[in-house]
């Protein structure tokens, strides 16, 4: 079946934003497709919120242009752009009922009164709060207030919904529930969601696509699986979850995709795909904690694996995390295993000598200069 070409709804072309002599975004190019859930992810100060505010029209561009649904809106005011924003604080009017909060934007647009009630109630039904229409925001929980803020944003039928750290004020359990609700609502509405967060788990859970930003630039653009399993640089690898970074030296090429290498003393095959490598070249081998296999050894026992000793353990319910200090260089390696209380080989002791291996092909390999 032929894949349908996706329609572009938002495009940032060579966008630069500076405050005085401080540049926050530099030549940012970004294409966002109609109907997708896109997350802009990055640490504080990376420029993600600035990018969102530029799309919304709350900030003026220094250079570049912003295209919304085929129209250049670079000089169009915020209230005339076909987007709505949900803020971290929700910004609900405490003196108004839920109905009037949701109806506020429609009244500002001078929508006829006979259209307001059905549109407001439709929006409230979408977030399953139609029975709370006559209550005040203070009578609702944090999660319910979040849903009202979303209802108020979608009642105007925007082409794009912008969400700025919108779940960060919620407790962990409620945040997890809202992640699922937001994604379900986005599918139901079929409109583009652009979500800004520093929370990697939120991004991986909800997104169709993730833009990882660092220092005002795109560090990687990909699906959640690509971002987690195939990081293109060390910044992305370390920002998205835990990762172990090993030094490696190429010994010889085995075939088009694999080389024999010395990885922290372990001689093994690693996949380099289409990388151009030569003998004695330095590489970085990246492995997630869950990809490493740990085997207990007696103190006098030798192994061709990477050798270390357990210095700490953390029980996490479904998993057991072990911190291993490598014997040859003192590096700490994190290993995560599914916990099985009936398996005596899982519940390791602090001080235990261990051998570390992994299934060849599970590693990510980067050039040393990429790190």
UniProtKB/Swiss-Prot annotation:
Residue span(s) of domain ABC transporter: 10-240
Catalysed reactions, semicolon-separated: ATP + H2O + polyamine-[polyamine-binding protein]Side 1 = ADP + phosphate + polyamineSide 2 + [polyamine-binding protein]Side 1
Listed Pfam families: ABC_tran (PF00005), TOBE_2 (PF08402)
Enzyme Commission code(s) on record: 7.6.2.11
Annotated compartments: Cell inner membrane
Kinase as UniProt keyword: no
Keyword Translocase in annotation: yes
Sorted UniProt keywords: ATP-binding, Cell inner membrane, Cell membrane, Membrane, Nucleotide-binding, Translocase, Transport
Disulfide bonds, paired cysteine numbers: none
UniProt xrefs under SMART domains: AAA
Cellular component GO terms, alphabetical: ATP-binding cassette (ABC) transporter complex
InterPro entries: AAA+_ATPase (IPR003593), ABC_SmlMolc_Importer (IPR050093), ABC_transporter-like_ATP-bd (IPR003439), ABC_transporter-like_CS (IPR017871), Mo/tungstate-bd_C_term_dom (IPR008995), P-loop_NTPase (IPR027417), PotA-like (IPR005893), PotA_ATP-bd (IPR017879)
Residues binding ATP: 42-49
Membrane topology: Peripheral membrane protein
GO terms, molecular function: ABC-type putrescine transporter activity; ATP binding; ATP hydrolysis activity
Record's subunit section: The complex is composed of two ATP-binding proteins (PotA), two transmembrane proteins (PotB and PotC) and a solute-binding protein (PotD).
Family stated for the protein in its record: Belongs to the ABC transporter superfamily. Spermidine/putrescine importer (TC 3.A.1.11.1) family.
Protein purpose: Part of the ABC transporter complex PotABCD involved in spermidine/putrescine import. Responsible for energy coupling to the transport system.
Protein name: Spermidine/putrescine import ATP-binding protein PotA
Gene from which the chain derives: potA
